[in-house]
Curated annotation (Swiss-Prot):
GO terms for biological process: translation. Part of the 50S ribosomal subunit. GO terms for molecular function: structural constituent of ribosome. This is Large ribosomal subunit protein uL30. SUPFAM superfamilies: Ribosomal protein L30p/L7e. Keywords: Ribonucleoprotein, Ribosomal protein. Belongs to the universal ribosomal protein uL30 family. NCBIfam families: rpmD_bact (TIGR01308).
Amino acid sequence: MATIKVKQTKSAIGRLPKHKATLKGLGLRKINHVRELEDTPAVRGMINRVHYMVEIVEE
């Protein structure tokens, strides 16, 4: 299956608990942390929820 690289660009401090949990679900912990994930609708939905804190590095 295709993969997607996601990078955390902003801190989770002071964010909604749901958004913090979404970052944890994506496996992101710190600013500039990059994870390679499977490109599924569930992962895309999680990225859309926290789009202001992450960026897609590579598809």
